[in-house]
C-alpha cells in the first residue's frame, strides 16, 4: 500500500453549532453539504473536512481526536494489507457519495481512515 496524500479530516464535537460557525465564518470554509448531524466543508483547495455533532448516532466510533483519512488508490486492497498486518479494522469497506472508505485503529489507539475516490461512470 502507498498512501498518496491526506484525503479527508473528520471530527466529532459536543459543541456542534459553535464549531460549524467557527469553520464557516472564522475560517471561511465553504459548506458543501449540510445534514442534521453533519456539515461537510471544503477548504479553498477542495480538501474536505466533516464536522459531526457529538450527539449524532452515526460515527459513534469516533473519539475525541480528529479522524484523518489517507487517500489510497485501492481501498479494498489497502484494507486487506492492514488485515494481514494484524491492524484492528473497524467494520467493512463502506461506499457512498463517490467515495469508498474503511476505518482502522492505529497503535496509538486513534481512529484512522483509508479512502478512495470511486470512478465515475
Where are these regions (language model features)?
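Short hydrophobic/aromatic beta-strand element in the GNAT-like acyltransferase core
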Residues: 40, 48, 69, 101-102
Amino acid at each position: 500500500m502507498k498512501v498518496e496524500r491526506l484525503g479527508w479530516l473528520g471530527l466529532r464535537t459536543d459543541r456542534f453549532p459553535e464549531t460549524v460557525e467557527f469553520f464557516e465564518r472564522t475560517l471561511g470554509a465553504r459548506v458543501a453539504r449540510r445534514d442534521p448531524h453533519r456539515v461537510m466543508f471544503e477548504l479553498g483547495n477542495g480538501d474536505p473536512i466533516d464536522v459531526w455533532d457529538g450527539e449524532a448516532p452515526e460515527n459513534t466510533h469516533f473519539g475525541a481526536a480528529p479522524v484523518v483519512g489517507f487517500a489510497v488508490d485501492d481501498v479494498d486492497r489497502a484494507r486487506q494489507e492492514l488485515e494481514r498486518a494484524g491492524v484492528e479494522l473497524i467494520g467493512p469497506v463502506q461506499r457512498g457519495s463517490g467515495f469508498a472508505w474503511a476505518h482502522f485503529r492505529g497503535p496509538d489507539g486513534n481512529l484512522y481512515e483509508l479512502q478512495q475516490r470511486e470512478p465515475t461512470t
